[in-house]
Amino acid sequence: MASTATGSREAARFEMPERLRADVRQLGDALGQVLREYGGDALLADVERLRELTIASHHEDQTVADDAAALAEQLVASWSLDRADEVARAFTVYFHLVNAAEEYHRVRSLRAGDRADHPLAGTVAKAVEDVARLAGHDKAKHLLDGLEFRPVLTAHPTEARRRAIVTSIRRIAHLLERRDDPRLGASEDAETHRMLLEQIDVLWRTAPLRVDRPGPLDEVRTAMSAFDDVLFHVVPQVYRRAEMALAGGAETVAAPQVPAFVRLGSWIGGDRDGNPHVTSAVTRQAMAIQSDHVLRALESACTRVGRGLTLDAGSTPAATELRRVLADAQAAQPELYAELAARSPNEPHRIAVLYAAARIGATRRRDADLSYTSAAELLADLRAVQASLAEAGAARQAYGELQGLIWQVESFGFHLAELEVRQHSAVHRAALEEIRAGGVLSDRTEEVLATIRVMAQIQARFGADACRRYVVSFTQSTDDVAAVFELARHALDGRPIALDVVPLFETGADLAACVGILDGVLELPEVQARLAETGRRMEIMLGYSDSAKDVGPVSATLALYDAQDRLTAWAREHEITPVSYTHLTLPTT
């Protein structure tokens, strides 16, 4: 399947870089080979003919363009339903391949411009470098110490691709990267091409859409592929590059100065506003899926790091604290410890990290005898290993791969991402009316209370930061925030729960009234207590889509800027620093 043609206004307007053009050409040719193998020359000829006519329909000569469009319509009308389906799938696969090539070309271009002494524009490392250059190292370090970067995973409402399709596309991108490796010999290059044809054939033969609409847990599992393949590995690289930028581009072998400032959030499995399929049971299962993925990733990473610490006790003796950790391990699990010691004789740091990996696996399996009670307990063990290595003069081992693992534990914990709950204020008002009236509660009210109980259960297992944000959609009064605290008291019979109730202002009227509403929110005792705990930090959400529907996109944008300006002044007046704004920039059409 060819990739370019002449005579097109679009081709002239969007000229591909040569390396991208070569990738697209190779992928198009490979797809053509797959189509020929599947349906013979006739299928490929139909696809090519439609492609040529479609390109010609954009010709600068309007008569040529109109004739080509008419011929294309006639061609499609002549096909059977099965042939039309095959051609449509061929073009779908082709566009997937072009997108994969474009994404990889962007990565290739970014890598080409990435230098240790000159970080890429738009990155955290570049921001750190700029601040250090303009305001000094100490100022940059101070800003990093207070930084929290919090990307939130959401389910894309228009994402219809199956995970199998996404996986195949990702494998094809990896093969494009492998093909660029200059170390490949002729046989390895041929094998890469064979694997590319195999993956394109898989993509062609895989049904592009699910038979059933994906449920919330399907969406959670889809998001986990991004964590498994990208986020878990990229986050420590972000820290490492920020560390280098803070050091002026120089390599360091000292204790890192960059804290773990990334904390993931997720609305998938927690956002129930308008979605009856997101129940308390779904929220519980969503967290279980998240935890399983992060624990598997940590176990694998810990095992890899441990296997690399083949430093014997003669050259790198264990410090006092690490000897205590090892003694505790031997007393708690003598058989496991003996097995590890036999495989790693006289290698105390290796034994300690591999023992930690075994405990992570036990935590995932819910093996109470061996599991960790918290991510903090794992961090304590890893830091004991790190301190021992540093004390023995093995700074490269202390602050190398082991530091990357520590950053991962600090960033993801045992829960991966904070699961945020969102519900409409009207649902809370209706639930409180039922509770105050007495009598039998409706299923919807019981579900509201059950959700809060699940939040408490998640906090009990993974810590308060695993599920503490409760977003109130369409916040219109102070009572809408107070309602969540009152519902929590009913749900838990007064037992404590850590809650950050986040007001979400969405309409033009609510944006205009937000400062007055927040004046009342500040008076709530639960909010006062939380401000004292956090150094007077507060999160506020400003909605975009519904305000745009309410007053129009231009007026909504102005209202958002005005609201943020007034909220900043309000926060300064009440010594709330910093105030965090989250903008929901959802589609308006």
Enumerate the language-model features and the residues they cover.
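Hydrophobic cores of alpha-helical transmembrane segments in multi-pass integral membrane proteins
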Residues: 32, 567-571
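A conserved P-loop NTPase coupling/switch region
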Residues: 494-498
